[in-house]
Structures are given as structure tokens and as C-alpha cells.
């Protein structure tokens, strides 16, 4: 990030962490509305404001912003540079074709570096695990691993 981007990110994080609800709640609601818009292929209705929804929105926004101000606690290319630590394990990478948060090229690069990984591209999905196609692919992958890892039937 360049200086001005860090200033925006850091100042937004400060607003989310401000103890005054008049400061942190509008920021948290906006954060979550933006994330909802980016993470799903089809427009979603934002949840109504309630005490429970506000608590969830605030905790989600603070947690995600904390990761961003700490550069996700990763060095540049750390995952791909250390992929050899897990290439002996089987994996399924579920990717939404219209994911603008983690674009498909990132999943393709991961699978190219991980011989035992299988890529499942979901044509009608973005990023969210709550989208029907992503959810079905995740459940299917889990079922395949359950079968693969279960002891043989007697």
C-alpha cells in the first residue's frame, strides 16, 4: 500500500475501534454493507439493524480491519513460497468464478503449486460461503474427504 491508502485504512480502523458507538457503528455498518456487496454475485438485502446484528457487524469489521492493518500477518507471497509444507496433503479449493475479493487467478496459482489440490470452480458465485453454489461445493468436498478418510467398512 502507498501512504494515502495506509492513511485511509488506518483511520478507518481507528474509527471502528473508537469507544463511541456514534463513531464505530456507522463505520461497522458501512464496512459490512460493502463486504456484502463485494462477496456475493447477486445483490443481497442488508440485515436490519438490531442489537445482535450490530454486535456481529462491529466484531466482523474490527476483526477484518485488524488483519488488514497487520498485512494479514503474512509476508508477500508467504503462502505460495511455503507451499511445500503441505503439498503432500490432498485438498479441494472451492472458488467462485466471479469472486472479486480473491480472484480466480489466485486459486489457479495455488492449485498449480499444489499437486494434490483439486480446483472446483463455481460458475454462479462470488466469494461468500453462503452462496448456494459455494455452499454445495464445500459440502460436496467435505463429503468426499469424509469418505476418503473413513476407515474401510467390514
Task: Name every feature range the model reports, one short phrase each.
Residues 66-83:
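Active-site nucleophile elbow and catalytic-triad environment of alpha/beta-hydrolase enzymes
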Residues 104-117:
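Active-site-adjacent alpha-helix of alpha/beta-hydrolase-fold enzymes
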Residues 12-48:
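Accessory cap/linker subdomain of secreted extracellular hydrolases
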Residues 1-8:
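Short, small-residue-biased leader/transition segments that mark boundaries at the very start
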Residues 46-57, 83:
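Small-residue-rich helix-loop
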Residues 75, 100-106:
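Conserved alpha/beta-hydrolase "acid-adjacent" motif
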Residues 86-87, 93-95, 99:
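Short beta-strand/loop motif that positions the catalytic acidic residue
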Residues 117-154:
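Catalytic active-site module of serine/aspartate enzymes centered on a nucleophile-bearing elbow/loop
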Amino acid at each position: 500500500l502507498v501512504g494515502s491508502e495506509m492513511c485511509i485504512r488506518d483511520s478507518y480502523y481507528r474509527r471502528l475501534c473508537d469507544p463511541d458507538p456514534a463513531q464505530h457503528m456507522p463505520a461497522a455498518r458501512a464496512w459490512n454493507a460493502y463486504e456484502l456487496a463485494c462477496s456475493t454475485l447477486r445483490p443481497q438485502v442488508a440485515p436490519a439493524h438490531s442489537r445482535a446484528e450490530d454486535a456481529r457487524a462491529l466484531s466482523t469489521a474490527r476483526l477484518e480491519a485488524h488483519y488488514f492493518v497487520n498485512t494479514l500477518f503474512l509476508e508477500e507471497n508467504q503462502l505460495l513460497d511455503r507451499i511445500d509444507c503441505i503439498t503432500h496433503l490432498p485438498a479441494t479449493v472451492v472458488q467462485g468464478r466471479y469472486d472479486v475479493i480473491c480472484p480466480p487467478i489466485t486459486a489457479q496459482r495455488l492449485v498449480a503449486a499444489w499437486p494434490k489440490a483439486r480446483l472446483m470452480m463455481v460458475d454462479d458465485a462470488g466469494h461468500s460461503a453462503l452462496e448456494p453454489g459455494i455452499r454445495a461445493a464445500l459440502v460436496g468436498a467435505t463429503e468426499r474427504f469424509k469418505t476418503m478418510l473413513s476407515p474401510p467398512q467390514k
